A protein has these predicted regions:
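Structured alpha-helical
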Residues: 1-142
């Protein structure tokens, strides 16, 4: 694939970002309803959302019909993950809208990526995300 937006099907999303992304590898729980949830990995995070990666089997639980998910579909999920800040673990709980859902070529193990746009934060979650991003972007002095 060689389009004006790059060589990968998700390059368009990467090129249209409002904020820089911080690459992290943290587990995330995504609640499908009150009883069902999936776990996946956060690939990157920014002040307005995050990219999650998972296996096809996990993605099927989120999207059982396998239909293309777009932002306009307005699918909202509740998420929960823990972020390390200054040697402490803080729980982030936020409702997110699925922004995109793509198959990643040539990625071992986690072959699905989907973007989540933050919608509604619980408690101090927005502060914890800001602190995490600030800490990750801050240069390390050795």
């Amino acid at each position: 694939m060689n389009s004006k937006h790059g060589d990968q099907p998700y390059d368009f999303y990467e090129e249209t970002r409002k904020y820089p992304r911080v690459h992290i590898n943290l587990p995330i729980t995504i609640y499908l309803d009150n009883k069902r949830y999936i776990t996946a990995s956060i690939y990157d995070i920014s002040p307005d959302g995050l990219q999650v990666r998972c296996t096809r089997a996990t993605a099927e639980a989120l999207n059982p019909r396998g239909q293309r998910i777009k932002y306009e579909d307005n699918i909202v999920v509740n998420t929960k993950f823990t972020v390390p800040i200054d040697d402490e673990q803080h729980v982030v709980a936020v409702s997110c809208q699925i922004y995109y859902f793509v198959i990643l070529p040539n990625v071992e193990g986690e072959d699905i990526a989907f973007g989540l746009k933050f919608k509604k934060f619980e408690g101090q979650s927005i502060r914890y995300i800001g602190d995490l991003i600030e800490n990750e972007l801050e240069p390390t002095i050795v």
